[in-house]
């Protein structure tokens, strides 16, 4: 019996299981549940349920970076070798080919007093899941941090300092929100540099038809899309 080979196989199987294992996170009151996993192509995928009813279907996460120009020295992080076009195509991919390196959960609860506003005190209470994702093909990693509150979910991408991800331009955000129906939303037009809008209440399907009415023109408003919104 080759004990060394068996131990190696067990370690490999454990790593493979860890790389694809589904992670779960619940809100402090237990009403919301989020799941996170990697699909067959190593793409990050999440879902969200409320009281055991799915509200966000499997939705992918990730970023598409601006493809670097091999003929411009200033565009990419310097190496002695000039990259070929295929390598640059792969390098622009920050949405596939990940493996799960680590997953950490935590809870945070504080109450703070705003200087002014409608509420005397505001409670900041959430459960957190931070997943560290390695991308072997590009020798880099990123963290996706989820925070699940009693009234909703938030997440962000984090890029710790590392040799192969120092400078980059985001071409396209590939974060998906695959809603399960034509839900009601409280929204303002998505803008480049302001939130100076009144909120509109409507179904998701009504966004395009109401966009012009929602824009009360002033010098600070520059909507970027007829359906681009910030929602609540």
Describe each model-derived feature in a short phrase.
Residues 24-232:
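N-terminal accessory beta-strand-rich subdomains and adjacent acidic, glycine-rich linkers
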Residues 1-24:
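Bacterial Sec-dependent N-terminal signal peptides
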